């Protein structure tokens, strides 16, 4: 039967049986007829029911809409009710005959069937001839505008689907009515033929039109050939099993149901009108040849990425019969030719994009589904999802084997295979269309993946990771990525640090806040060059100080200008005095530290029974020496606040790690070259457990703790509301505005906050990481800085650091410690018994005195910071206006003087005695460098 308006009939014939006589038609078409009247009558009796059923299905599934020229009728009558009625004509006989006389007009093949159905087939043939004549005339009229762009493919596909009208179907045929918005179902019946000879056969016709050359019939088992596919978008469509009734495609012993969506029309769906033939490429799904199951083709994604198509790369359509063998029977398949009305020509604006979409669909449950076996690799036939026509497999195995499965597609028991042709590069052969990818998904999900490649080389593809389907039962992920060398700058969703970079980062103990320090590279270079680092790689320039367990030297790394502070400890001396545990504790603590106000341990090694710790060098000396240089031997209050604020952050970090410092004094606070401080000496520190918690502020509502303290407050003002964070937060150490300045300035948006909002901002949760449960009975520290609980021997915890913090602030402001006596015994007695007193000079603000009073409370449980640690202290009015997050951006009160050894070997060579005197002897260079330990 000839094809018309969106359908084709596929019938079977038995080879080597009855050979029907053939004769040529008017236009060179082969027409087959019955050999005798007896044969026709016998075939009528044997196949009367089957033929009527197929014709009934054909006329019910296909209804051609009337065209703009009213050349086609709107419907057909049922065969059972009006089998002998003549076909309805929409054109007069004269017009129809005139159209048939036009040169080059193709006509449908004549076929001789049963006597009862001659009138219906004749009507079908006449309609095909009329339609073909109309399209040929329109084709000649459109040649004048050949220079204009082609009609948009979206409009062509849409017009193709619009030709199928809405018509109710009977339950016997199982056809689904057409819905323009949701898709249409097109049925292609395949008639199985038994061993008896067949009298109803259809032969494809050949149109000899020079403008549309048709290739010779293929013997490879397919009827459509696609050529010249390049720079086009491919899709992955996953098919799902279903047993729901619908339009089915009979294939041997099984039915396959394919649902089409008319919204699929897009520039990526290539269909070309050339001499009444529609060329359709790419969107193909492998069709099993030996299967008795049903398959649903899910609706395609509406937003399909488009790609450019060059005119010289357009493929030609083969209109050749396809002979295949199914279940021991020979099947002859006839391809259809769809005439198309003239469409207005438009420009096609194409964009290349990469899109991954995951959509879900509702399908029958597992109880209703049937398992589809694997496909036979020998029968690899492709079926177009839009026109239901067999296509030639154009996949070329020119890709790596790991991504190629074009010739052996397989279907697992829990999912169906989907065929995807990868994009060909611009510079590759136009006949190469990539390889086929087979992916899997769960039964209730559909994954549509579109990929477009516009790069001319293999390194421009990039990494692509497919989203995991939302079905909880699915545990498979599809991930496509390239090497990091091919996709520099691309980050996948499962990014991880490489082992090489990870080892290079932590092999030398690199710290984030010191990651840009050139001293790391210098140390690493020596380790790589010599295999290990030792004392022989350093030149000792100067003795910086002596402590209880070791001596600190200024050293220079040989071959560089990098200066380090090396703490050298004699292992035999430590073992003899039972101080090895203290040295070991300091090494472990230094390894843990990573803070801008704490030392950085660059390396540690043992050389000649000497344990060495290589740390950063602070050329500014310590706060004790720096205080001696100040006028009145005390710091101004702003400078003191700068230093104690950074010390407070260092103590907060230590307490968060479960480290109680216990030896806070000006001698252990060094000044870096940038003016900021560094806390050092951890041999007396105590390690304990800590449990960080979040707490809320308990300040009374409606009160501003920043304004509570003043000249009229008494000394007994250490209340919870005094330690609340101030409402206004400005930059580090910015000058306060007087009342006159505040009255003269313009109000800002933040000034209009309600009291409730201000209270909520002050009552935000605070992190408390104070080791409140830590207890120790050791008598450690310096006499003047010892806490009362240490002297009494009652056991102590983290509160001893806040006592020493108060003593340090007192000394920085007044130039002396608050409880110093004539000797150590009197000093200890004053710490326990004497009340805190403030000298009359220098003048110190009330906020500073109030903070000192809160810190120097003799009962540790009532001491400021004993409950919540640094959170309580940071909220004190003494630190009002301090931005703790940007404290490193604040300008230091004083920068250290230029150090003569900072110039490296050149500066040392200019020193008296030349380079031979660079190495100094270990002798005391001042009392202020000695570590006074109890």
Swiss-Prot record:
Protein location: Cytoplasm; Nucleus
Domain Protein kinase stretches: 538-879
Binding site for ATP: 544-552, 567
Annotated EC: 2.7.11.1
Similarity comment: family membership: Belongs to the protein kinase superfamily. Ser/Thr protein kinase family.
Protein name: Serine/threonine-protein kinase KIPK1
Database matches in InterPro entries: Kinase-like_dom_sf, Prot_kinase_dom, Ser/Thr_kinase_AS
Active site residues per record: 663 (proton acceptor)
GO cellular component terms listed in the entry, alphabetical order: cytoplasm; nucleus
GO function terms (MF aspect): ATP binding; kinase activity; protein kinase activity; protein kinase binding; protein serine kinase activity; protein serine/threonine kinase activity
Tissue note: Expressed in roots, cauline leaves, flowers and siliques.
Keywords linked to the UniProt accession: ATP-binding, Cytoplasm, Kinase, Nucleotide-binding, Nucleus, Serine/threonine-protein kinase, Transferase
Function: Could be involved in the negative regulation of root growth.
Keyword ATP-binding: yes
Catalytic function, reaction form: L-seryl-[protein] + ATP = O-phospho-L-seryl-[protein] + ADP + H(+); L-threonyl-[protein] + ATP = O-phospho-L-threonyl-[protein] + ADP + H(+)
């Amino acid at each position: 039967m000839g094809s018309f308006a969106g359908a084709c009939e596929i019938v079977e014939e038995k080879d080597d049986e009855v050979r029907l006589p053939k004769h040529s038609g008017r236009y060179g078409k082969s027409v087959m007829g019955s050999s005798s009247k007896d044969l026709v009558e016998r075939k009528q009796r044997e196949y009367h029911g089957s033929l009527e059923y197929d014709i009934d299905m054909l006329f019910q599934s296909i209804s051609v809409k009337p065209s703009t020229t009213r050349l086609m009728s709107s419907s057909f009558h049922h065969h059972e009710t009006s089998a002998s009625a003549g076909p309805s004509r929409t054109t007069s006989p004269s017009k129809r005959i005139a159209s048939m006389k036009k040169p080059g007009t193709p006509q449908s093949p004549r076929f001789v069937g049963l006597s009862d159905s001659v009138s219906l087939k004749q009507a079908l043939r006449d309609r095909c001839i009329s339609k073909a004549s109309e399209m040929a005339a329109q084709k000649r009229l459109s040649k004048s505008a050949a220079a204009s762009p082609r009609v948009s493919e979206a409009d062509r596909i849409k017009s193709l689907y619009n030709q199928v009208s809405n018509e109710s179907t009977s339950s016997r045929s199982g056809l689904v009515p057409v819905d323009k918005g949701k898709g249409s179902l097109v049925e292609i019946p395949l008639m199985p033929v038994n061993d008896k000879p067949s009298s109803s056969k259809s032969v494809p016709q050949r149109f000899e039109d020079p403008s549309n050359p048709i290739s010779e019939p293929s013997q490879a088992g397919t009827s459509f050939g696609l050529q010249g596919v390049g720079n086009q978008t491919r899709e992955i469509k996953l098919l799902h099993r279903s047993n729901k009734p619908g339009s089915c495609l009979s294939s041997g012993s099984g039915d396959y149901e394919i649902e089409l969506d008319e919204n699929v029309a897009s520039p990526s769906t290539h269909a070309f009108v050339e001499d009444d033939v529609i060329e359709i490429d790419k969107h193909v799904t492998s069709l099993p040849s030996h299967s008795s199951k049903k398959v649903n083709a899910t609706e395609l994604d509406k937003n399909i990425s488009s790609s450019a198509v060059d005119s010289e790369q357009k493929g030609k359509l083969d209109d050749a019969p396809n002979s295949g063998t199914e279940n021991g029977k020979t099947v002859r398949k006839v391809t259809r030719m769809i005439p198309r009305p003239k469409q207005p020509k438009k420009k096609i604006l194409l964009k290349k994009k990469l899109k991954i979409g995951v959509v879900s669909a509702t399908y029958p449950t597992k109880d209703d589904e049937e398992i589809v076996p694997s496909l036979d690799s020998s029968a690899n036939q492709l079926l177009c999802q839009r026109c239901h026509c067999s296509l030639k497999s154009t996949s070329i195995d020119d890709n790596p084997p790991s991504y190629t499965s074009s010739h052996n597609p397989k279907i697992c028991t829990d999912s169906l295979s989907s065929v995807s042709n990868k994009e060909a590069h611009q510079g590759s052969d136009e006949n190469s269309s990539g390889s086929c990818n087979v992916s899997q998904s769960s039964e209730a999900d559909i994954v549509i993946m579109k990929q477009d490649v516009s790069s001319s080389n293999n390194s421009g593809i990039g990494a692509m990771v497919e989203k995991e389907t939302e079905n909880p039962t699915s545990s498979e992920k599809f991930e496509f990525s390239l090497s990091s060398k091919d996709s520099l700058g691309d980050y996948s969703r499962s990014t991880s640090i490489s082992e090489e970079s990870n080892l290079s980062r932590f092999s030398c103990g690199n710290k984030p806040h010191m990651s840009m320090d050139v001293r790391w590279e210098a140390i690493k270079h020596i380790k790589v060059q010599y295999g290990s680092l030792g004392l022989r790689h350093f030149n000792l320039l100067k003795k910086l100080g002596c402590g209880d367990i070791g001596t600190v030297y200024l050293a220079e790394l040989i071959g560089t200008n990098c200066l380090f502070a090396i703490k050298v400890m004699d292992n035999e001396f430590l073992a003899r005095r039972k101080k090895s545990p203290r040295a070991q504790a300091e090494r472990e603590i230094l390894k843990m530290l990573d803070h801008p106000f704490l030392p950085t341990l660059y390396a540690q090694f043992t050389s000649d029974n000497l344990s060495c710790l290589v740390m950063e060098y602070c050329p500014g000396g310590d706060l004790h020496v720096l205080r001696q240089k100040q006028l009145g031997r005390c710091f101004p209050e702003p400078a003191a606040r700068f230093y104690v604020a950074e010390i407070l952050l260092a103590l907060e970090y230590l307490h968060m790690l479960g480290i109680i410092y216990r030896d806070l004094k000006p001698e252990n606070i060094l000044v870096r070259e940038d003016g900021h401080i560094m806390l050092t000496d951890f041999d007396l520190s105590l390690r304990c457990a800590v449990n960080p918690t979040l707490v809320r502020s308990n300040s009374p509502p409606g009160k501003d703790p920043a304004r509570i303290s003043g000249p009229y407050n008494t000394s007994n003002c250490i209340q919870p509301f005094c330690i609340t964070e101030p409402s206004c937060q400005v930059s580090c150490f910015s000058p306060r505005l007087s009342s006159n300045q505040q009255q003269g300035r313009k109000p800002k948006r933040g000034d209009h906050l309600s009291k409730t909002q201000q209270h909520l901002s002050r009552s935000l949760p605070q992190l408390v990481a104070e080791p409140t449960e830590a207890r120790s009975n050791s008598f450690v520290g310096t006499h003047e800085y010892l806490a009362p609980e240490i002297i009494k021997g009652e056991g102590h915890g983290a509160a001893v650091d806040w006592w020493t913090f108060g003593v340090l602030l007192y000394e920085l402001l007044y130039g002396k410690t608050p409880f110093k006596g004539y000797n150590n015994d009197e000093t200890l007695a004053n710490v326990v018994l004497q009340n805190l007193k403030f000298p009359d000079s220098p003048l110190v603000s009330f906020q500073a005195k109030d903070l000192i009073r809160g810190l120097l409370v003799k009962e540790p449980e009532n001491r400021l910071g004993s409950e919540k640690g640094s959170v309580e202290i940071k909220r004190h009015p003494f630190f009002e206006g301090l931005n703790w997050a940007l404290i490193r951006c604040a300008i230091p009160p004083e920068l250290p003087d230029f150090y003569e050894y900072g110039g490296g070997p050149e500066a040392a060579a200019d020193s008296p005695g030349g380079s031979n005197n660079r190495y100094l002897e270990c002798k005391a260079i001042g009392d202020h460098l000695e570590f006074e330990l109890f």
